[in-house]
Structure formats: C-alpha cells, structure tokens
C-alpha cells in the first residue's frame, strides 16, 4: 500500500535531501523484499493458512509469536493514526472543515469498505489504483514543466541526516504481515505469489521515489508540509491542489483497507477465533481496531 510512508517522506527528508532518501529506498526495498519472500515461502510450506503470529508460533515458539503479534498491532495502529490525522488535514485544506470533521468523513469509506472484507477491498483497490497512477503521472509531468521548478533541489544532499532517514524508508515498506493474506488470496495459484510480491515491491519503490521527487523539485525545503500533496498542490495551483490531495486520500484509503483487514485477521488468528467473517467476531474487533486510533487522533493525544 502507498499511504503514510509515501506522503510523509518529502517532509522527513527535507534536511537530508532526495539522494539520501532514494539510497535508503533502494536498500530497504531490497531487504524488505527478501524478508517478504521468506515469509511467502514459509506461508506456502505451512498447510494451514495462518497469519504472521501463527507462523512465528509454529517456527519460533510462543515467545516469538507474542513479539510478532505486538509488532503487527503497534505498526498497524500507528499507520491508522497517521491516516486519520492526515485525512483530517487534507480535507481541512480542501473543504475548510475542521480536522476532526475531515477525519470522520474519511472514516465512512475507510471503515465501510473494510467491513465487507477482501472481495470488496479487491474491487475498490483495482479501480482506485488506476486513478492513482493517472493522477501521479499528471502531477509529475506538471511539476517537471512548472516555472518554479528547480532541478538543483533534487540533487542536494546532507548525509549527516542519513541514519534517521533509514527509519522513514523502512517504515514506508513495512508489509511483511500482509503476505499471509496475499497467500490466502492466491491459494489456488501459489506460483503467482512470489512474482506478485516482487512486482508490487518494484511499483511501491518507484512511487515512493516519484512523489518526494516531484514535490521537492517545485517546493523549497522550508515550505514542505508533513503531507506532501498539500505542498505539491500549493506550488502548482488550485487544480493541482485538488488532484494531489485526492491522490493522497485514495492512497491512505487503500492502505487503510489492507492494514485494517490484516490486523483483524491477525487478531482472529492469534486468539484462535473460528472465522473473521462471522459478524459476532468481526463487529467487536472492528470497533476496537477503528476506535483506538480514532480516539487517539480526535483527542489530540498523538499527532
């Protein structure tokens, strides 16, 4: 998924520069791909389709399972907090509504589609992915021909800030816990799993580089915003403000769907509930995994 990582990297790397960011995107992309392939192989070797904590319990024992489960929960909730917060900022910019109202508007399609599970998300992702690619091509092309563009900005670098950027790049790629769900979706064609992961990782890498490159090319470092598309739109004009931020909302939305479904499946697997499609199980878990990040975002406890 392209979500908080893609949209926050330009701001995070404003002191280090694009070359440092690209270097870490390539390194962490390769490392993450290796780990995802390892998880994919382990998943396919395990006859029962289980989530990452289930695999860890089988091969690493109970302690490993608990640690992996905690990591999945923390990372998933962190991403969802960023999506709720970022969507509020974007809709405030576009519609002039308070941030908390924007967050609640985002919540409707985010939680609504996620409720119906993998099939609904699959259809939504296909349609929105095409739209995202078209919008990204338009924005990037407009950036390259913009009068306020400055090529020197994308070549500036300060390796003193390289280490913190590693963390940003690694966070952008984290998706190993999505692999068991991919295996579940391709259980009838297991040979397609590894190529699908590799292609997906390549596409993510390209998108992760294009977004900050386009933003940094037309925006001075001191004017970069935490959500990249806000600065992108301000630099290109009103039309771009809407396109860029609709792109951002779609990116957050599709990532939210994947992460929320995976977190739900991990909880069901860890506590050995019989199915994540049972309403009596799905409803209370959904309320919890939506309610925690939503409450933290609206309360201002995190930002």
Question: What do these predicted ranges mean?
Answer:
Residues 1-11, 16, 33-37, 49, ...:
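Membrane-interface "cap" regions at the ends of multi-pass membrane proteins
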């Amino acid at each position: 998924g392209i979500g908080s990582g893609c949209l926050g990297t330009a701001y995070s790397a404003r002191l280090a520069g694009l070359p440092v960011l690209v270097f870490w995107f390539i390194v962490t992309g390769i490392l993450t791909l290796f780990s995802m392939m390892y998880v994919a192989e382990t998943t396919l070797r395990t006859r029962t389709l289980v989530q990452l904590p289930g695999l860890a319990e089988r091969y690493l024992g109970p302690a490993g399972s608990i640690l992996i489960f905690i990591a999945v929960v923390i990372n998933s909730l962190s991403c969802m907090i960023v999506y709720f917060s970022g969507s509020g900022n974007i809709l405030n910019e576009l519609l002039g509504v308070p941030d908390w109202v924007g967050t609640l508007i985002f919540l409707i399609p985010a939680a609504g589609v996620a409720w119906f599970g993998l099939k609904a998300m699959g259809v939504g992702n296909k349609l929105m992915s095409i739209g995202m690619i078209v919008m990204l091509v338009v924005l990037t092309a407009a950036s390259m021909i913009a009068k306020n563009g400055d090529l020197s900005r994308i070549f500036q670098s300060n390796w003193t800030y390289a280490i913190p950027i590693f963390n940003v790049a690694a966070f952008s790629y984290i998706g190993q816990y999505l692999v068991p769900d991919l295996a579940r979706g391709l259980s009838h064609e297991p040979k397609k799993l590894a190529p699908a992961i590799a292609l997906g990782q390549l596409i993510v890498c390209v998108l992760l580089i294009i977004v900050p490159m386009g933003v940094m090319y037309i925006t001075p470092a001191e004017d970069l915003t935490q959500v990249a598309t806000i600065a992108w739109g301000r630099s290109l004009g009103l039309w771009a403000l809407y396109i860029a931020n609709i792109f951002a909302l779609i990116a957050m939305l599709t990532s939210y769907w994947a992460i929320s479904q995976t977190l739900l499946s991990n909880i069901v697997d860890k506590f050995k509930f019989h199915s994540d499609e049972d309403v009596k199980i799905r409803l209370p878990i959904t309320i919890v995994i939506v309610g925690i990040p939503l409450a933290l975002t609206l309360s201002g406890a995190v930002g």
